[in-house]
UniProtKB/Swiss-Prot annotation, chain A:
The lineage of its organism: Bacteria, Pseudomonadati, Thermodesulfobacteriota, Desulfuromonadia, Geobacterales. Allows the formation of correctly charged Gln-tRNA(Gln) through the transamidation of misacylated Glu-tRNA(Gln) in organisms which lack glutaminyl-tRNA synthetase. The reaction takes place in the presence of glutamine and ATP through an activated gamma-phospho-Glu-tRNA(Gln). GO terms for biological process: translation. This is Glutamyl-tRNA(Gln) amidotransferase subunit A. Keywords: ATP-binding, Ligase, Nucleotide-binding, Protein biosynthesis. One of its GO terms (cellular component) is glutamyl-tRNA(Gln) amidotransferase complex. It comes from Citrifermentans bemidjiense (strain ATCC BAA-1014 / DSM 16622 / JCM 12645 / Bem). It catalyses: L-glutamyl-tRNA(Gln) + L-glutamine + ATP + H2O = L-glutaminyl-tRNA(Gln) + L-glutamate + ADP + phosphate + H(+). Pfam families: Amidase. The gene is gatA.
UniProtKB/Swiss-Prot annotation, chain B:
This is Aspartyl/glutamyl-tRNA(Asn/Gln) amidotransferase subunit C. It catalyses: L-glutamyl-tRNA(Gln) + L-glutamine + ATP + H2O = L-glutaminyl-tRNA(Gln) + L-glutamate + ADP + phosphate + H(+); L-aspartyl-tRNA(Asn) + L-glutamine + ATP + H2O = L-asparaginyl-tRNA(Asn) + L-glutamate + ADP + phosphate + 2 H(+). The keyword Signal does not apply. Pfam families: GatC (PF02686). Allows the formation of correctly charged Asn-tRNA(Asn) or Gln-tRNA(Gln) through the transamidation of misacylated Asp-tRNA(Asn) or Glu-tRNA(Gln) in organisms which lack either or both of asparaginyl-tRNA or glutaminyl-tRNA synthetases. The reaction takes place in the presence of glutamine and ATP through an activated phospho-Asp-tRNA(Asn) or phospho-Glu-tRNA(Gln). Heterotrimer of A, B and C subunits. Keywords: ATP-binding, Ligase, Nucleotide-binding, Protein biosynthesis. One of its GO terms (biological process) is regulation of translational fidelity. Its EC number is 6.3.5.-. It comes from Citrifermentans bemidjiense (strain ATCC BAA-1014 / DSM 16622 / JCM 12645 / Bem) (Geobacter bemidjiensis). Belongs to the GatC family. It is an enzyme of class 6 (ligase). Disulfide bonds: none annotated.
Length: 485, 95
């Protein structure tokens, strides 16, 4: 076992026992990045100098007996988190040279605990994508099979866990962008309830859907990292002021007697046979652990993708209006007049997927189409949210696949955006409903690619899904298998 | 057709995006197929349904009207593509 293979809690024990220092752990991680990241491209920016300064500081804290769960732990951040003095690109040319003047709240919380930030991770441009292929900084590869995508948009955050180039990472999830790459890369990814984690200092894509969450090697780490970043923040007026429970303390409670619902609309024809088999085995496992399994119905599931691509693109078109070449970001050189400076700067700075979504969103919000598209989608969102609330009257947790197939090949879906969008069918409804979901490793395809299982909880039911995930992980141990890299 | 090339050009102007001829052609086709897919929402009767703009029910969030710190002029201008003294410099607005 190398230092870079360890989980947060394993490394924490070694740091606490002074078996290893944070500087040693950080050097090991930086060496690992140097050795393998040219194959994976999980990092947009590596920050060795700052990381070693933070590691020395962590070692001083540990020597003084002030060790928190994340003190001295090398972590990576999706490049959507603004970091003071460290370039933050959001995977876009328009922010290629942007150096933020402040830290966002999640980042500040990690720093307060003494976590070591080793770098900024690859992602789809402005978190728009399901394959990490829309990044201006080149596609990220799946460590289990370098010809496959790691999923997206937090592709780098998931690939770094699988490649063991970060002990843990943070990502964001707007329509599945934590859970789907976690599933494709064989790690644990959690999207918390909307409002659980502050979005302050997270570059906005679709503000009513975006949420910050952890990608980790196991469920215990997920609980630890969520606990570290969760909580009310006056700087984000949509963050919710409810107490943050001790997510680790309740992990071992077990699943005996809990009611697990299987939404019948998620177990349909067309599900990849390997995914289907993994789900059947997981259901059997939960039965053997004493859970009460029943079928439930989420009748409006088939409308979720259409609803999402109206709401998310509409919000994106408004959020991305700020990239105008005036205060920060790319400015076109040879524009005549102010209006052309805007439209040329944006044309040069944004890639095709971002342009496509700005166009769709602008159209949906434009005069004459607002009611037909945007308001209609918001009404359907109400129905989808209602489906979940109704299901949670009958069961505690929902069990579903994360994606219809394991990781797909690079370039396979690039020419057909609609096919790419449809691959998010099992994750999008959770964002529309605003509730929480976790992806847990649940087996492998015949080709050796990881398959994830999704557990969906009630709003602020993170404890329940973490507990259910932990019971499964303890029995199956899929998470211990390592990518061949 | 759900959307014409002329409409796509109009939307590009609204969005302040200068698109090439090739991009206009590609987006017209792609937006047409996506909007055709989105049509399926019309199969649902949503008469009387309240639209959801936000997942968590919430009131306006107010804070006390007190001055707090700011990042300062130099930090605010540090990423400016072009500046003049303590201002962002832009091309002439009125010809």
């Amino acid at each position: 076992m190398e230092i870079f293979d360890l989980t947060i809690h394993e490394l924490h024990e070694k740091l606490k026992a002074k078996e290893v220092s944070s500087v040693e752990a950080t050097r090991a991680m930086l060496d690992r990045i140097e050795a393998v990241d040219s194959q994976v491209n999980a990092y947009i920016t590596v920050t060795p100098e700052q990381a070693l300064v933070q590691a020395e500081d962590a070692d001083r804290r540990i020597a003084a007996g002030e060790i928190a769960p994340l003190t001295g732990i090398p972590v990576g951040l999706k490049d959507i988190f603004v970091t003071k003095g460290i370039r933050t690109t959001c995977g876009s040319r328009i922010l290629e040279n942007f150096v933020p003047p402040y830290d966002g709240t999640a980042v500040a919380k990690l720093k307060e605990q003494g976590a070591v930030i080793v770098g900024k991770l690859n992602q789809d441009e402005f978190a728009m994508g399901s394959s990490n292929e829309s990044s201006y900084f080149g596609p990220c590869k799946n460590p289990w099979d370098l010809s496959c995508t790691p999923g997206g948009s937090s592709g780098g955050s998931a690939a770094a866990i699988a490649a063991r180039t970060a002990t843990a990472t943070l990502g964001t999830d707007t329509g599945g962008s934590i859970r789907q790459p976690a599933s494709h890369c064989g790690c644990v990814g959690l999207k918390p309830t909307y409002g659980r984690v502050s979005r302050y200092g997270v570059i906005a894509y679709a503000s009513s859907l975006d949420q910050v969450g952890p990608l980790t090697r196991d469920v215990t780490d997920s609980a630890l990292l969520l606990g570290a970043v969760a909580g009310y923040d006056p700087m984000d007026s949509t963050s919710v002021n409810t107490p943050v429970p001790d997510y680790v303390a309740s992990l071992a409670k077990g699943v005996k007697g809990i009611k697990i619902g299987l939404p019948k609309q998620y177990f349909i024809e067309g599900l990849d046979p390997d995914v289907k088999r993994a789900m059947d085995e997981a259901i059997a496992m939960y039965k053997s652990l004493g859970a009460d399994i029943r079928e439930v119905s989420l009748p409006n599931t088939e409308y979720a993708v259409a609803t999402y691509y109206i709401i998310a693109t509409a919000e994106a078109s408004a959020n991305l209006a700020r990239y105008d070449g005036v205060r920060f970001g790319h400015r076109a050189e040879d524009a005549r007049g102010l209006a052309q400076m805007y439209s040329k700067s944006r044309a040069e700075g944004f890639g095709p997927e971002v342009k496509r979504r700005i166009m769709l969103g602008t159209y949906a919000l434009s005069s004459g189409y607002y009611d037909a598209y945007y308001v209609k989608a918001q009404k359907v969102r109400t129905l989808i949210q209602q489906d979940f609330l109704n299901a949670f009257k009958e069961v505690d947790v929902l069990l579903t696949p994360i994606a219809p197939t394991p990781a797909f090949k690079i370039a396979e879906k690039l020419e057909d955006p609609l096919q790419m969008y449809l691959s998010d069918i099992f994750t999008i409804p959770v964002n529309l409903a605003g509730t929480c979901g976790i992806s847990v490793p649940a087996g492998f395809s015949a080709a050796g690619l990881p398959i994830g299982l999704q557990l969906v909880g009630k709003p602020f039911g993170e404890q329940e899904i973490l507990t259910a995930a932990y019971s499964f992980e303890r029995e199956t141990q899929w998470h211990l298998k390592k990518a061949p890299l | 057709m759900k959307i014409t090339r002329e409409q796509v050009e109009h939307v590009a102007r609204l969005a302040r995006l200068e698109l090439s001829e090739a991009e206009l052609d590609t987006f017209t086709g792609q937006m047409d197929s996506i909007l055709s897919y989105v049509e399926k929402l019309n199969a649902l009767d949503t008469e009387g349904i309240v639209p959801t703009s936000h997942a968590v029910p919430m009131e306006n969030a107010f804070r006390a009207d007190e001055a707090t710190g700011s990042i300062g002029v130099e930090a605010a201008l540090a990423n400016a593509p072009l500046r003049a003294q303590s201002f962002f410099r832009v091309p002439k607005v009125i010809e």
